[in-house]
UniProtKB/Swiss-Prot annotation:
Protein name: Uridylate kinase
Keyword entries, A-Z: Allosteric enzyme, ATP-binding, Cytoplasm, Kinase, Nucleotide-binding, Pyrimidine biosynthesis, Transferase
Pfam families in UniProt: AA_kinase
Database matches in InterPro entries: AceGlu_kinase-like_sf (IPR036393), Asp/Glu/Uridylate_kinase (IPR001048), Uridylate_kinase (IPR011817), Uridylate_kinase_bac (IPR015963)
Binding-site list for ATP: K12, L13, S14, G15, G55, R59, N163, Y169, D172
UniProt family annotation: Belongs to the UMP kinase family.
GO molecular function terms attached to this record: ATP binding; UMP kinase activity
Naturally occurring in which organism (per UniProt): Streptococcus thermophilus (strain ATCC BAA-491 / LMD-9)
């Protein structure tokens, strides 16, 4: 087997990725299909962390705009990410993959608290760790959670698994047939161009900690493994890449 490009990765999934064609809620067959892809990679000896959004269940910003207290709205969203994490963990465990959920808010009846040293020991023992409940504070996105946790666990890369989007473009390819896809970008270019891969806080964290981002289409079976083993798919963002287009 070829040598992997990345040996420890953090996979960032949107909450909507778990909803399937419904777009909202949790579609269990969809979760199970994603879990199967992740399990195949774990079987290759890759150390894997996951961060899953909560947008399939709740969005804090629209709730705040509708009149809800923003802090309470964001805490509600953190609970949504925990629900998604528990469902994904169960699907992975049913495939024989030892998995732990760690939450930034204490929920000891259902998950471990986030402790960096414990997470690192889980990786050493071949376990997948799912980080839930954001960073435990309002106003921070799950993109920022992914960037922060990736830095803390010294992940080689963040894999931004997208629904039906095969990389980063200079315009929306669904609206502009002439939109150009980038193969490689620098973190600085992403920030300067205002490309919405992650929010600005998450992008800056990734740049400052020299963490690669790979944006790719998760709906294509085998793509997670292809990215990890160095196949050029999607868009890679790093401090070293040169702008190609």
């Amino acid at each position: 087997m070829a040598e992997p490009k990345y040996k420890r990765v953090l996979i960032k999934l949107s909450g909507e990725a778990l909803a399937g064609e419904k777009g909202v809620g949790i579609d269990l067959p969809t979760v199970q299909a994603i879990a199967k892809e992740i399990a195949e990679v774990a079987d290759s000896g890759i150390q894997i962390a996951l961060v899953i959004g909560g947008g399939n269940l709740w969005r804090g910003e629209p709730a705040a705009e509708a009149g809800m207290d923003r802090v309470q709205a964001d805490y509600t969203g953190m609970l949504g990410t925990t629900m998604n994490a528990l469902v994904m963990a169960d699907s992975l465990k049913q495939l024989g993959v030892d998995t732990r959920v760690q939450t930034a808010i204490d929920m000891k009846s259902v998950a471990e608290p986030y402790i960096r040293g414990r997470a690192l020991r889980h990786f050493e023992k071949g376990r997948i760790v799912i980080f839930a409940a954001g960073i435990g504070s309002p106003y921070f996105s799950t993109d920022t959670t992914a960037a922060l946790r990736a830095a803390e666990i010294e992940s080689d890369a963040i894999l931004m698994a997208k629904n039906g989007v095969d990389g980063v473009y200079n315009d929306d390819p669904r609206k502009n047939a002439d939109a150009v896809k980038f193969d490689k970008l620098t973190h600085v270019e992403v920030i300067k161009r205002g490309l919405k891969i992650m929010d600005a806080t998450a992008s800056t964290l990734s740049m400052d900690n020299d963490i690669d981002l790979v944006v790719f289409n998760m709906n294509e079976p085998g793509n997670i493994k292809r990215v990890i083993f160095g196949e050029q798919i999607g868009t890679t963002v790093s401090n070293k890449a040169e702008l190609r287009k």
